[in-house]
Amino acid sequence: MFPNVEQYQAALQQNLSSIIVDKSYHSASIEMSALGIPRIRSGNFALVYKLKLSNHDKALRVFYRTNFDIANRYEEIIKIINLLNKQQGNQNYFVETSYQVSGIRVDGNLYPIIIMDWSPGLSMGDFVSINYKNATLISNLQEALKNAFYVFEKNNIAHGDIQPGNVLVSKDGKNITFVDYDGMFCPSIKRFGASEIGHKNFQHPDRTERYFNEK
């Protein structure tokens, strides 16, 4: 069983050197809310915190509920996204990601974490809301999405939860980055089955857990 939200919140108000195992993050600080407590961005299975370092920021993902084999699943997902980033050169569709099986100490016990680069950019939802009257920018976004999906199809992978909050867009609309890989599909994890079916407002209404493939 994983810690709950309150346990993570209490732990992350301590000095990070006492709870984060990886020493390279001991000098980091957690982004705080206006109330002076760690700011949370939550997902289906994980809480996301912003780690602020001197020269760059990272996303810290901690799990608070799950019903799938995290370690084996993410080990395979990270392999494929890092490989695709190398192949794509300047257009990385995924952020650099690492999985640490014993990454955080909460109430004396060690739990897994995921560390990801903090990717700049507007969410696709915000980008469209701001620029919907700008045909050039919307066309740039359309082309970027088309190119990304071509790469996905060629490599037999699927993000699994394409929705406005999971796609970050550059100011000119030409570069996009996908985040939140909990529902991702690649052939090497087909045996695990689907961990989620994505945001219901952006998926086919007949989609169920038994549909777990590159489509």
Positions of predicted regions on the chain:
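Juxta-kinase regulatory segment immediately upstream of eukaryotic protein kinase catalytic domains
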Residues: M1-R39, N72-I80
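ATP-binding glycine-rich loop module of kinase domains
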Residues: G36-P38, N44-V95, D107
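Conserved structural core of kinase catalytic domains
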Residues: Y93-N140, R191
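Short C-lobe core helix of eukaryotic-like protein kinase catalytic domains
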Residues: A144-E153
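Catalytic-loop of the protein kinase fold
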Residues: E153-S170
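Activation of the activation-loop gatekeeper triad in protein kinase-fold domains
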Residues: V179-F185
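Conserved activation segment of eukaryotic-like protein kinases, specifically the C-terminal portion
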Residues: F192-R207
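Conserved end of the kinase activation segment
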Residues: D206-K215
